[in-house]
UniProtKB/Swiss-Prot annotation:
This is Uncharacterized protein PA0525. Residues 213-238 are annotated as: Disordered. Component of the anaerobic respiratory chain that transforms nitrate to dinitrogen (denitrification). Function unknown, but essential for the denitrification process. Keywords: Cytoplasm. It comes from Pseudomonas aeruginosa (strain ATCC 15692 / DSM 22644 / CIP 104116 / JCM 14847 / LMG 12228 / 1C / PRS 101 / PAO1). Transmembrane segments: none annotated.
């Protein structure tokens, strides 16, 4: 019996692979992933005028009401198709493409979709709008025509045969083929009951997403995210909200003798299992829709106490009532006045401290090194009076006099004190992601603390005015501004104690922090004012401050800082920084530190370079 079962499973597995391979319309050997094309696609999209703040994300295959062949119905394939869409905020491309038998054609299809999206506008009529965008793109860039022709020719060979289509479907198929071959040549398309075979070269209407979760949902999602990391794709799913069944209001609506029959098909209020399904993540990958419960309790839930603000007796010490700051809403294209409350704070329990022992040797070397760069006295040549004779000027004067010149000589060298004309504000991102471990002993926050301490030691020896601050946030009403050292405060044990008392915070409302830093730095009298930002990720917060909204607000804050004559510069350890920091700070406005442990050393190297 066991052998028969194993044989049946073996035959079934081989039959499944055989039938799906012959019925599938994809070519696995030529599959190309979006992740491998993400950077060049972003460059293409922005080079042709696409908004820099638009996110490039993966989207799952979409279920379409297609007319499938008998073999496809038997195999259960071709129910979903990889389609692309663009809604102005994000460009959604398939997680992978295998629609062509050649990998290069699949890469070319990715490039075409990115270029088409850069030319796209609001989608009102699927076929007419895609024709218009394609025609505009090909007219503006004739060099694209051969590439587009290759994609169309390869796709037309894969479309259903006209002989196998009903009359109405065949009429639509002819119109689509003509529209693909000659964009703009077809104005009217016949109506049919089923969707036409997918057109991977066109953009489809965007998905209708359910409203974002409430604030409470956001906290629970953030708390649950830290429990366990499951390997999964980057594609987003469509979602719908459902009401969770309440196990406390069960009502017996059936007779017990029917328990195993029709009762199983009734929409009864049954309680759910409290344990997490170990196969849930795998099953979710195969679903088109995810049903999201409004139930506040979690299955197998754990607590993330660090996501909630601590009690006042244990929280950091607030300094004053807080400051109201504006925030940029890119949808309305205006600043929302007094939208954010920034609370200055100091770490609780911070006491005067000396430099940690593991930094003493490095600090001594840096103090000596930066002391050599300390501003001293500058020598001015050809002065009418001074401390010593300028020999070069005297020789020039003698030559001119013998030639008959009568230039009034400036024969002296004068030494004057060199004015320090640079002020620097160092702003550190203290979000919860800094709690991540670099190795078995050190965290990201430890590297940031070392960077702040060594930066203070070096600039104290150099003599440049500087200030140290940190920030994190919990929604717009709680942007926590850690005051470590003001410009008018000396660097010493008190400042070291505050830095050593730092701990990972919450989220990253970067725009508000940059605006406050610009206010502080803008009040300094120095001609050159440098704003350095230490960061480890994108701007994000609980209340819609993520994605393009957070990116655009941060960019606007950087623009405001530059308009005040400040020089903002970001130093990051985020390996994906190249995807968004050029838009925020410019191509030369940021530096990536590959290893977080090298942050202290690289910070001071960059400061020396920027100081010149």
């Amino acid at each position: 019996m066991a052998f028969a079962v194993e044989l049946e499973e073996w035959v079934g597995a081989h039959w499944h692979r055989f039938i799906t391979r012959h019925a599938s319309g994809e070519f696995e050997a030529a599959r190309v992933t979006l992740e491998s094309m993400r950077r060049p696609l972003g460059m293409l999209f922005r080079a042709l005028g696409g908004a820099p703040g638009v996110a490039l994300e993966a989207t799952p295959a979409r279920r379409l009401l297609l007319r499938r062949t008998w073999l496809q119905r038997v195999a259960g394939t071709c129910e979903q198709a990889p389609v692309s869409w663009f809604n102005g905020d994000s460009l959604r491309l398939p997680e992978s493409l295998a629609v062509y038998p050649q990998a290069e054609l699949n890469r070319e299809l990715y490039r075409w979709l990115a270029l088409l999206a850069a030319s796209a506008g609001p989608l009102r009529h699927w076929a007419q709008d895609n024709q218009r965008w394609a025609r505009q793109l090909l007219d503006a860039y004739p060099a694209l025509r051969p590439r587009y022709a290759r994609l169309v020719a390869a796709h037309l060979r894969q479309r259903p045969s006209l002989d196998d289509c009903p009359a109405a479907d065949a009429e639509l198929e002819i119109a689509l083929r003509r529209a693909l071959a000659e964009p703009g040549s077809v104005e009217r398309f016949p109506r049919v009951e089923r969707a036409p075979w997918p057109v991977p070269l066109w953009l489809y209407p965007g998905e209708r997403w359910t409203p974002s979760a409430s604030a409470e949902d956001g906290e629970e999602a953030a708390a649950g995210a830290g429990k366990r990391q499951v390997a999964r794709s980057g594609a987003r799913k469509r979602a719908e909200r459902i009401e969770e069944r309440n196990s406390e209001r069960n009502l017996l609506l059936f007779r017990l003798e029917s328990l195993l029959s029709w009762s199983e098909h009734l929409a009864l209020d049954r309680c759910s299992d409290d344990e997490d399904d170990p196969d849930g993540a795998r099953v979710a990958e195969d679903l088109d829709y995810l049903s999201l419960s409004r139930q506040r309790t979690q299955k197998g839930g754990g607590l993330r106490l660090d996501l909630d603000l601590p009690a006042a007796d244990y929280d950091d010490l607030p300094l004053g009532p807080g400051l109201k700051l504006p925030e940029w809403d890119y949808r309305q294209q205006r600043l929302l006045s007094d939208h954010v409350l920034l609370q200055p704070m100091r770490p609780r329990g911070a006491t005067s401290a000396s430099l940690p022992a593991h930094l003493e040797k490095t600090a001594l070397h840096l103090r000596r090194q930066f002391a050599c760069l300390r501003d001293g006295r500058q020598r001015l040549r050809q002065q009418p009076q001074g401390d010593e004779i300028d020999l070069d000027a005297w020789l020039d004067f003698q030559v001119e006099r013998r030639r008959g010149g009568s230039t009034q000589p400036g024969l002296f060298l004068e030494q004057r004190p060199r004015r320090r004309d640079l002020a620097c504000l160092l702003l550190a991102d203290l979000s919860m992601s800094t709690e991540a471990y670099l190795d078995d002993q050190r965290r990201v926050i430890d590297s940031i603390v070392d960077s702040l301490l060594l930066f203070g030691e070096a600039l104290q020896a150099l003599g440049d005015p500087f200030a140290l601050y940190g920030f994190s946030s919990v929604r717009r009403q709680q942007v926590r501004w850690q005051v470590l050292k003001d410009f008018d405060e000396g660097y010493g044990g008190e400042v070291r104690g505050r830095v050593l008392a730092l701990s990972p915070g919450y989220y990253t409302r970067m725009g508000a922090a940059i605006r406050r830093a610009s206010q502080v730095l803008g009040g300094q009298p120095q001609k050159r004012r440098l704003l350095l930002l230490l960061s480890d990720g994108k701007p994000n917060d609980l209340d819609r401050y993520e994605g393009r909204y957070g990116i655009e607000d941060t960019r606007q804050a950087v623009i405001e800082a530059r308009s005040q004559g400040l020089v903002p510069f970001c130093i990051t350890i985020d390996k994906e920084a190249a995807d968004y920091l050029p838009y925020l700070f410019g191509a030369d406005g940021f530096a990536l530190v590959e290893r977080a442990g090298q942050l202290p050393e690289r910070l001071l190297q960059l400061y020396r370079r920027l100081r010149r």
